[in-house]
Amino acid sequence: MRIAELTALLHLASPALPIGAFSYSQGLEAAIEAQLITDADSAREWIASGLTDVLARGELPFLAHQMERWRTHDAESLRVANSEFLASRESAELRRETEQMGWSLRQLCVSLEWGDADRRATLASMTPLAQPTAFAFAAYAHDAAVDATLAAYAFSWVENQAAAALKAVPLGQLAGQRIIVALREPIDAAVTRALATSPDNINTFAPQLGILSARHESQYSRLFRS
């Protein structure tokens, strides 16, 4: 891997990227409220399940195929796939989350003039924009490999989930680091599975997550926006 590619992916996966990822828990806070998560072990199991049963089957293969569509600049397919991803969000919170993060990442891409002008124009015209579509553009604009991009995206997701668990369970810093370390190998497996998934086999079916996310919208006390 080239150093420029590595640093670009580190940038995109960084918690310092100003797209608001820190403000979302993607159902984890609702799982804590429902007492599905009570300690470090149950937090690790929940996050691992999200990685292998949700991300690996849905978001990661979607990201991979969107990168290919950016490469060929198939604008119509990009828009259709983006709309399908938005429609797959099972609650208002999850829909707003991906739209807000997609909008913020697009602002960054356009302001920093990443990629070529024609593709940036296509990106700017897509409203609302799903966050993985914007992430795929940013990774393509930096000539990042698909497998490395998926690994960076998955690691960023795991890290954000662990950070949410630290605040909401709550857990100690060492417990959070143990969760991240435990999920490094599963990230590898998730990427491998995602790369082997065709567009027709992308699956976003996660009823428990959808129900918990919907409940979170009216949860009395909460730290996160999802």
Swiss-Prot record:
> Which InterPro entries does this one have?
UreF, UreF_sf
Identify the keywords attached in UniProt to this record, alphabetized.
Answer: Chaperone, Cytoplasm, Nickel insertion
What does the UniProt record say this protein does?
Required for maturation of urease via the functional incorporation of the urease nickel metallocenter.
Annotated family:
Belongs to the UreF family.
Q: Gene name on record? A: ureF
A GO cellular component term found in this entry reads:
cytoplasm
List the subcellular locations: Cytoplasm
Give the GO molecular function terms: nickel cation binding
Source organism per UniProt: Paraburkholderia xenovorans (strain LB400)
According to UniProt, the name of this protein is: Urease accessory protein UreF
Main localization category: cytoplasm
